[in-house]
Amino acid sequence: EFTTLFLLFSVLLLSASAEQCGSQAGGALCASGLCCSKFGWCGNTNDYCGPGNCQSQCPGGSPGDLGGVISNSMFDQMLNHRNDNACQGKGNFYSYNAFISAAGSFPGFGTTGDITARKREIAAFFAQTSHETTGGWASAPDGPYAWGYCFLREQGSPGDYCTPSNQWPCAPGRKYFGRGPIQISHNYNYGPCGRAIGVDLLNNPDLVATDSIISFKSAIWFWMTPQSPKPSCHDVITGRWQPSGTDQAANRVPGFGVITNIINGGLECGHGSDSRVQDRIGFYRRYCGILGVSPGDNLDCGNQRSFGNGLLVDTV
């Protein structure tokens, strides 16, 4: 009996003292913006956050540490109405921890270039995805650009978005309308996205709207993946994309505007001012302000010819 009690006490002691974060805890993150120490514990003093003591979510970040570009508090400030009662995402579906976890599957996302490039990429990513999921309006509390990440699924009465394909066959009864931060749509996007992230999205497309990490992964996959003749959004915002002669003739130049062209240029670009483009820019400027970085040049696409039909459905 004594041996049994001793073993039980030992188990309880070990479980109570188990590490909280980082490599010692399967990559878990600290809550409330705390730093993860090199030993796997959460805190906010020098023992946790200081140079040589911090392994993740460190002040100022480190190469490869997305937490140094966007903190939990910044995330909440940017998407401060995502849990409004009128939003599908209420209940913290779009959480900071889910975003950080998903981003870890895409080396280079938010970690490429100097701190200016990294901040611009995060601002641009959240601006474009906020436009796709916005629940805001002109006179909304805190302004129209505080309502990103409100919706999980395409609004209205969307169709099945099934294009006959041998490579990406539609599953019986499944619909491939817009879901998640980037509102990924069509079987020919769900198929390769699912293959890339290791999930069968052709048979289970609604995972993009029910699993937070998969939802973020779908958006980051689109962001990081070039689809010829389009470059990836990532390569554009980090300065890796160099316009070809064809691009230059079409006025497609590096900047936030060409990312809008990649996403929905067939509908929004090449015809002067467009309210949807301005909405994207409004989000981008706000997020750049929160992250403390200038937005750069060439923000709109009014004089750019489109790459072709957009791969996504515009939900606004």
Curated annotation (Swiss-Prot):
Listed name of the protein: Endochitinase 2
Enzyme class, UniProt record, top EC level: hydrolase
InterPro entries registered for this protein in UniProt: Chitin-bd_1, Chitin-binding_1_CS, Endochitinase-like_sf, Glyco_hydro_19, Glyco_hydro_19_cat, Lysozyme-like_dom_sf
Cell compartment(s), UniProt: Vacuole
Family: Belongs to the glycosyl hydrolase 19 family. Chitinase class I subfamily.
Highest taxon above the source species: Eukaryota
Disulfide bonds: C21-C36, C30-C42, C35-C49, C54-C58, C87-C150, C162-C170, C269-C301
Role: Defense against chitin-containing fungal pathogens.
Swiss-Prot/TrEMBL induction comment: In response to infection, elicitor, ethylene, wounding.
SMART domains in UniProt: ChtBD1
Domain named Chitin-binding type-1: residues: 19-60
Cellular component, GO annotation: vacuole
Record-annotated membrane-spanning stretches: none
Lineage: Eukaryota, Viridiplantae, Streptophyta, Embryophyta, Tracheophyta
Signal peptide extent: 1-18
Propeptide feature: residues: 310-316
Single GO MF descriptor: endochitinase activity
EC number of the protein: 3.2.1.14
UniProt GO BP: cell wall macromolecule catabolic process; chitin catabolic process; defense response; polysaccharide catabolic process
Pfam families assigned: Chitin_bind_1, Glyco_hydro_19
Main location class: other
Catalytic reactions on record: Random endo-hydrolysis of N-acetyl-beta-D-glucosaminide (1->4)-beta-linkages in chitin and chitodextrins
Active site per the UniProt annotation: E132 (proton donor)
Keywords, alphabetical: Carbohydrate metabolism, Chitin degradation, Chitin-binding, Disulfide bond, Glycosidase, Hydrolase, Plant defense, Polysaccharide degradation, Signal, Vacuole
